[in-house]
Amino acid sequence: MSSQLEQIFARLRGSADFEGVDFSDINACGIDGDNPLHCVVRWGDIAAAKILISAGIDVNKAGDLSYTPLHVACMNGNVEMVKLLVDNGADLFAFNEGDLPFTTARIAGHDQICEFLAPLMQKLQSGDSPIWVRARIAQLRREIARLEASLEGK
């Protein structure tokens, strides 16, 4: 493990959410379900996000309230972070508890992020429609399975 990763994990271990978490799996989650990328996005730490992404962290991991790191960046209004995540495969159509990252940015009043995301979303939707529909169906099936699993645990 690189010293840069170790520094990020040391900072995370300092929070109650990640106390005792084994970071031998880079996607290890804290008690609220967030992975390290959620946290560095929340911190606005672009350099740390790049380190985690290059180390193979899941950029689409749903954490607390089903927020992905992209939802967090959109909520916080960090345009540079949004661009970094999108450039590294963040799902523009990931749902949290009912909202897309675009909607999260719109509700938070981050118009610059909406202006960045809208044409990308339109381009994806206007592409090869059958492929897009199949991808959305697969994504929705995963979300339904996740929600059903969470209901079984209650």
Regions found by a protein language model. Name each.
Residues 1-48:
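N-terminal segments that cap or nucleate solenoid repeat domains
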Residues 13-21, 45-53, 78-86, 110-118:
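Ankyrin repeat structural motif
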Residues 10-13, 39-44, 72-78, 104-110:
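Ankyrin repeat A-helix N-terminal signature
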Residues 1-13, 106-154:
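Ankyrin-repeat-protein effector appendages
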Residues 30, 63, 95-96:
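Ankyrin repeat boundary/linker residues
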